[in-house]
Amino acid sequence: MSARTLDGKATAAAIKAELRERVSALRERGVVPGLGTILVGDDPGSQWYVAGKHRDCAEVGIASLRRDLPAEISQAELEAVVEQLNADPGCTGFIVQLPLPSHLDTDAVLELVDPAKDADGLHPTNLGRLVLNVNRPITTPLPCTPRGVIELMLRHGIDLAGKDVVVVGRGVTVGRSIGALLTRREVNATVTLTHTGTKSLDEHLRSADVIVAAAGVPGLVSAENVKPGAIVLDVGVSRVEDPETGKSRVAGDVAADVAGVASWISPNPGGVGPMTRALLLQNVVESAERALR
C-alpha cells in the first residue's frame, strides 16, 4: 500500500481563493478585514513567521497592521499596544507572536486580547465556549491548527463520523483543543488523547482509524504502530541535525515508513502548516463578517 497525500498546499490555496471572494464582498459593504501582528524582539524565526502571515494577507486582500516592538519593552507598554489593536476598528483579528521575552507575562498579555479579535482561536474565553458548544453553530474564532487538520481531511472526502481518532500531544495549540472540535455532532468522531507519558501508546496507535501526531518527538509514529489503512496527520515540529549536511532541519513526528502502511498521510512540511495559515485568515474574515450581523 502506498498512502495518498493530504495536500495542504493545494487545499490552503483553495481556501484562500474562497476567502478572496468573501473579502471582496465585505469591501463592497465598506468593510476591509485587517490582521494585526505583535512581534517583540528580533528573533529570525518569529520574523519569518510574521512576514509569511502578512504575505498571506496580501494574497486575499486583507489589510496588514504590523507592530514590531523592541525586546526590552515593558509589560505595561506591550499591554498598551494590545489595547490599541483591541480598539482599532480596522483590525478584525490579531495575534501576539510567541515566544515573548522571559521578562514578560505571556498569559496576562494573551488574556488581554479581545476574544472577538483572537485570530489564533486560543483565547481562554473562546476555548471555553468551544468546549460548551456541542450542537450550536460556531460564533467564535476557532483554533487554527485543529480546524486545519479537520478541514484537510474533509476536503479530501474523508468522513470522520464514527472514526476512532488518537491524538498524540497535550499542548493547547493542538492536543487539548482538537478533541472539542472532533467530538462536535457535525463531525462525530471518537477521540483518545494520548501523550509521551501514556502507557501502551503503541496499542492506542495500532487501534486508531486516524492518528494526529502533535507531540514534537521526531519519528514517534512509525509503520510498526500504525494499522494498515489508517489516516495519519503529522503536526509535530522539531529541529534535528541533518546527518549529511550537519545543518539543522525541521522534522515531524511521523517516520517515512508510515507512507507504506497508511491510506492517507499529510506531508511535513506541506500538510497541516499551510492549512493553519489559511485558517488564521479565515478567522480574521469571519470576525469581520460577524461584526456586520
Curated annotation (Swiss-Prot):
The UniProt entry's GO CC annotations, sorted and at most eight, read: cytosol
Q: In which pathway does it act?
A: One-carbon metabolism; tetrahydrofolate interconversion
- Please indicate which superkingdom the organism of origin belongs to: Bacteria
Reactions accelerated catalytically: (6R)-5,10-methylene-5,6,7,8-tetrahydrofolate + NADP(+) = (6R)-5,10-methenyltetrahydrofolate + NADPH; (6R)-5,10-methenyltetrahydrofolate + H2O = (6R)-10-formyltetrahydrofolate + H(+)
Does this entry carry the keyword Ribosomal protein?
A: no
Keyword DNA repair part of the UniProt annotation: no
**Protein keywords:** Amino-acid biosynthesis, Histidine biosynthesis, Hydrolase, Methionine biosynthesis, Multifunctional enzyme, NADP, One-carbon metabolism, Oxidoreductase, Purine biosynthesis
Q: Name one GO molecular function term.
A: methenyltetrahydrofolate cyclohydrolase activity
Q: Which InterPro entries match?
A: Aminoacid_DH-like_N_sf (IPR046346), NAD(P)-bd_dom_sf (IPR036291), THF_DH/CycHdrlase (IPR000672), THF_DH/CycHdrlase_cat_dom (IPR020630), THF_DH/CycHdrlase_NAD-bd_dom (IPR020631)
Transmembrane annotation, as ranges: none
Q: What is its EC number?
A: 1.5.1.5, 3.5.4.9
Q: Which Pfam families match?
A: THF_DHG_CYH (PF00763), THF_DHG_CYH_C (PF02882)
- Chain sites annotated for binding NADP(+): 169-171, 196, 237
Tell me, which GO biological process terms does this entry list? L-histidine biosynthetic process; methionine biosynthetic process; purine nucleotide biosynthetic process; tetrahydrofolate interconversion
Q: Give the record's family classification.
A: Belongs to the tetrahydrofolate dehydrogenase/cyclohydrolase family.
Q: How does it assemble?
A: Homodimer.
Q: What does this protein do?
A: Catalyzes the oxidation of 5,10-methylenetetrahydrofolate to 5,10-methenyltetrahydrofolate and then the hydrolysis of 5,10-methenyltetrahydrofolate to 10-formyltetrahydrofolate.
HAMAP family cross-referenced by the UniProt entry: THF_DHG_CYH
User: Know the name of this protein?
Assistant: Bifunctional protein FolD
- Species for this entry: Leifsonia xyli subsp. xyli (strain CTCB07)
Q: Which gene encodes it?
A: folD
